[in-house]
Amino acid sequence: MFISVLLILFALCVTLIPEAHYHMVRVWSFVATIIPMWVVTWMWWNFDASGHGLQMLVILGRSHLAFGIDGVALSLMLLTTVLFPICMMLLRTVAGFMTFILLEVLVLSALCVLDLLGFYILFEASLILLFLLIGRAPYGSLEAAYKIVLYTMAGSLVLLPTLFMIYSECGTTNVLYMTCAYNHQTVLGWGLLAVLAVKIPLMPVHLWLPEAHVAAPTAGSVLLAGVLLKLGGIGFLRFMLPVVPEFCVSVFPLVSTLCLVSFLFSTLSTLRQIDLKKIVAYSSIAHMSMVTLAIFSQSEFSAYSSSFLMIAHGLISPALFLIVGILYDRAHTKFILYFSGLGASMPIGSTLFFLFTLGNLAFPLFPNFIAEVLCMVSIFAVHELLAYVFCVCQVLGAAYGFWAFNRVVHGLPRGPADVTRTEFHTVLPLLIGAVWLGIKPMA
């Protein structure tokens, strides 16, 4: 809560600076995203990892609006505060600075809010900024922006009346005090599943994500893959499993089928894409499908494995979008057919592309490897056949990853310049974080 207030104050300070002083606006905006990172680092240092349940609880008066963190939320908050300064280095407009500061306020608040209605409001408010970010980008698309709104609002219209019904029955929407009878669990469970399946996303409500990534600027794609998709995962872990546990057990066959179809379809779709951003976007759908299935398995390692995969994906996928953005700045295209021989003209960029491609394919020494192994263990505990099918589908993931890398890096060189110092520094923290988590996952 303190971080959100601090960011709002910084946003107000930035608005008082004349636009003519662009450099000062950029510096203050960057500082506005650095300070929350230090605050969250202090929270990490003082967090009791051996304890269970929520810590650092803050309850606002009689409204029962509560904020608190657990290990999953704190890890995602740390990831969020690392990604936002990187995005600030990519922005060039004052409106973009303000949009990203406000978006960080909404995301950090959503990660630590304990009220279902509050989560819903913050969740939907982030869509407004995402709509502006995608619809008004230099090469943005209003069609993609409207797609996001239509898909998400369809799920939200199911959840909102359900929340009012639950509030009339329980007198609160705070997860600390909510108790739902089984008949209410069914109604609330379907509402939550409808809205979170769009956000994470699962088939058949996934089509907005590739279009959004293609239309968004590089900074928008970094946040969408690294942070905003994780709101669906935190919604499942914090609100759905504790509030409607019996519904989650009864709906597991349906969810597991959706996850399997989403994983298989997104992987096969990736093999036929020619847009580099769509390749990374469809791979994100595959990873988040595995996250969802691990969560609903409710085995001993399900919470840890799913949250670890979200964090690993939040490091690897944004880095791939950064590299695609670097290639776009050189060639002004994202189509894979126009790239060739970058290994000769961009040795540093090609090396980074190779390393993060390995990370995306769950190669050892990267956190995706540990996370996906733990997810497989969680799935094996409840359904062995399903786990075997997921293991076989992983081979397709290796196929599209190496095909894209081979097409871009090898062949006759076409001469784009290598990465600049600033571009290298935007990717370097993600590489360090990914390798560190891959070597020391319990840190």
UniProtKB/Swiss-Prot annotation:
Any idea where this protein resides? Mitochondrion membrane
User: Which Enzyme Commission numbers does its entry carry?
Assistant: 7.1.1.2
- Which reaction does this enzyme catalyse, per its entry? a ubiquinone + NADH + 5 H(+)(in) = a ubiquinol + NAD(+) + 4 H(+)(out)
Mind telling me which residue stretches traverse the membrane in this protein?
1-21, 27-47, 71-91, 93-113, 114-134, 148-168, 187-207, 217-237, 247-267, 279-299, 308-328, 335-355, 362-382, 385-405, 423-443
The UniProt entry's GO biological process terms, in alphabetical order, are: ATP synthesis coupled electron transport
Membrane topology of this protein: Multi-pass membrane protein
Lineage top rank: taxon: Eukaryota
Q: What class of enzyme is it?
A: translocase
Kindly name one Pfam family recorded for this protein: Proton_antipo_M
Q: Which GO terms describe its cellular component?
A: mitochondrial membrane
Molecular-function GO terms, alphabetical: NADH dehydrogenase (ubiquinone) activity
Q: Which InterPro entries match?
A: NADH_Q_OxRdtase_chainM/4, NADH_UbQ_OxRdtase, ND/Mrp_TM
Alphabetically list the UniProt keywords: Electron transport, Membrane, Mitochondrion, NAD, Respiratory chain, Translocase, Transmembrane, Transmembrane helix, Transport, Ubiquinone
Q: Record's family?
A: Belongs to the complex I subunit 4 family.
Please describe what this protein does. Answer: Core subunit of the mitochondrial membrane respiratory chain NADH dehydrogenase (Complex I) that is believed to belong to the minimal assembly required for catalysis. Complex I functions in the transfer of electrons from NADH to the respiratory chain. The immediate electron acceptor for the enzyme is believed to be ubiquinone.
Q: What is this protein called?
A: NADH-ubiquinone oxidoreductase chain 4
Organism in which the protein naturally occurs:
Chlamydomonas reinhardtii
Q: What is the lineage of its organism?
A: Eukaryota, Viridiplantae, Chlorophyta, core chlorophytes, Chlorophyceae
